[in-house]
């Protein structure tokens, strides 16, 4: 999967390194200042998709510094019966291969992409924007918030 990510201009973050996060923020700011877009996954981890983990606010800072909006987008997966699908889960001991096999082994999984209003244009700080984005995504995807 790494080669695919590299081909699509992915900016890789070394987890747990504040110094590296600062470097990444500089790179994100450069991309944003060129008028391009950057997608970040502020949970910083994977889950089974049944709840929303805490958001890390650091990677939101470049958008605020560049005067660019933060556009929260929720992605959820559903069974044709209307129940939430766990087939795309990629957490715990599940390998990427197992995750992919679970997805392609399904006859049908419905993916829902929910957009929410732009944030960060009214002087909020990154933590306020992260909290508002988390709440918007949880509401849009119908997910409970977790504190872990």
Where is each model-derived feature located?
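Membrane-interfacial amphipathic helices and adjacent loop/beta segments
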Residues: 1-30
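A cross-family acyltransferase "interaction/gating" segment
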Residues: 2-3, 17, 36, 50-128, ...
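Conserved beta-strand segments that form the floor/walls of ligand-binding pockets within enzyme
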Residues: 11-12, 39, 114
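Short low-complexity stretches enriched in small and charged residues
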Residues: 26-30, 43, 67-75
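Generic beta-sheet signal
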Residues: 36-42
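Short active-site segment of divalent metal-dependent hydrolases/proteases
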Residues: 46-47
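Cytosolic-facing loops and C-terminal tails of multi-pass membrane proteins
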Residues: 127, 131-148
